[in-house]
Amino acid sequence: MSENSPDLYRETNVFERGNWLVKGDKVKADVPKLFSPIQKDGAKNRMDLALWLTNKKHPLTARTMVNRLWEQIFGNGIVETLEDFGTQGVSPTHKELLDWLAWQFMNDDNWSIKKMIKTIVMSATYRQQSTVNDELLKKDPYNKFYARGPRVRLSAEQVRDQALCISGLISDKMYGPGVMPFQPKGIWNSPYSGEQWKQSNGEDQYRRGVYIYWKRTAAYPSMTTFDGTSREVCTARRIRTNTPLQALVTLNDSAYIEMARYFAYRLQKEASINVDAQIRKGYELATGHVIDNRDLAILSGLYKNALEKFNRDKDKACEMIGVNDEHNNPETAAMVVVCNAILNLDEVVTKL
């Protein structure tokens, strides 16, 4: 991509009252006058703007960027108000740290986001345990001074993508038009449009959340429940909420039941026929650490209770698996219940 030569630049005018037929004063590309000017004579282009933004004499760009990276990792930025970095926003909790990270980002890291993330996640601050005791809770109730590691619920896209990955369903396909995974009928019903949600076929319905087709007036429901934005307006900062509806989505949404089902198929294929071995494997895949005896006993008990119910009522197993599915049996249906519980664990939907 390159800029047009100066002789190809077009004239730009202010449209009086927004009417493109009534041209007002001529305008030229430049930055707002309240900022320091771009030090260049003549016409200014995108390269000039990029160089101006990354000028080390005013590290606002670097400070804003590292603050957003910090928020993604720790749950809150050093300046909590990501959307307002000025005098009307909240003051930084660690001014010197913010300055040092910005300097590191501009100089040693040469604006590399990957290097900056590595610096943060390899720090002793990030690598702390997120468990809290009464003493720490009293001294630092909101963890503003990082008395413990971060504990942050995953974003809407991350919750879905992680469940797809754990179940083995996720598609690595990249690019292309938006996809339409399963969602309840009637979401798109509107009096002014005959458009319908047409569920994608094959691997397209298991692609990452960033590829989901988004209609501003009828957003993908499970995403909005987990604070995904409607995109009707620009959102500079997402506020995380915790509501009972979120648990109802991951427990009962048809898409998440399907993920739990394929998770169970994966465990039966990759682990031994021993149920406890399958549960151990599933827990480790989902959480990244080995299950303890207490949690194993709880999940084993859940499996036994579900198996008893499905043995008494085979139709319930059919509802869980599907009548024409080769895995249609009480044992697999019971494992689906366990897998659904694992995908809903706090350790899975929360970054600890």
Give the role of each language-model region.
Residues Y213-R216, T224-C234:
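A structural supersecondary motif
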